[in-house]
Amino acid sequence: MKIGSRVKHPRLGEGIIIDFCKYGGVLIDYSDDKGVLVRVSHRDTIEVIHE
C-alpha cells in the first residue's frame, strides 16, 4: 500500500489512499459523482485493488 493506491472497503466502496495516520489508520478519498467523502479507515478493513 502506498499513497495513490486504489483500495476497496466492504461498506464504503472504492477509494484512493491520500495519507497514512497513526495507529494503523489510512485516510481514503471515497468521492464520486454523487458527492465528496473522505474518511479514515483501519488498514485491516481495506483491500488493495491496484497499487
Each language-model region and where it sits:
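Basic/aromatic-rich interaction segments and small domains that mediate binding to polyanionic partners
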Residues: 2-51
